[in-house]
Amino acid sequence: MAKEKIRIRLKAYDHRILDQSAEKIVETAKRSGAKVSGPIPLPTERTVYTILRAVHKYKDSREQFEMRTHKRLIDIINPTPQTVDSLMRLDLPSGVDIEIKL
């Protein structure tokens, strides 16, 4: 028998709200009777931007800024219709990007 699985991928710049959102999803899925695997931390994506501090010259004087994208993966195995319904009603912060695969 093939097992059904919902894979949820979360992305955010702030790891605290990402972990809170992941905890809400896991708690909601467990309450509805589904088996949950995760949250699994995925590698953090780090983007570095280098700009010149001065406008015209002084090429040796530069400043670097970085942007970190934190990611988590949650698998919900054998979800019930109640699980899917409760996940659809879940209210998550606006800074979290959610990608769901069935």
UniProtKB/Swiss-Prot annotation:
Residue ranges crossing the lipid bilayer per the database entry: none
GO biological process entries: translation
MF terms in GO: structural constituent of ribosome; tRNA binding
Keyword Transferase tagged: no
UniProt keywords, alphabetically: Ribonucleoprotein, Ribosomal protein
Cited InterPro entries: Ribosomal_uS10, Ribosomal_uS10_CS, Ribosomal_uS10_dom, Ribosomal_uS10_dom_sf
Subunit structure, as described in the record: Part of the 30S ribosomal subunit.
Similarity section: Belongs to the universal ribosomal protein uS10 family.
Protein function: Involved in the binding of tRNA to the ribosomes.
Name of the protein described by the UniProt record: Small ribosomal subunit protein uS10
Species the sequence originates in: Geobacillus kaustophilus (strain HTA426)
Gene: rpsJ
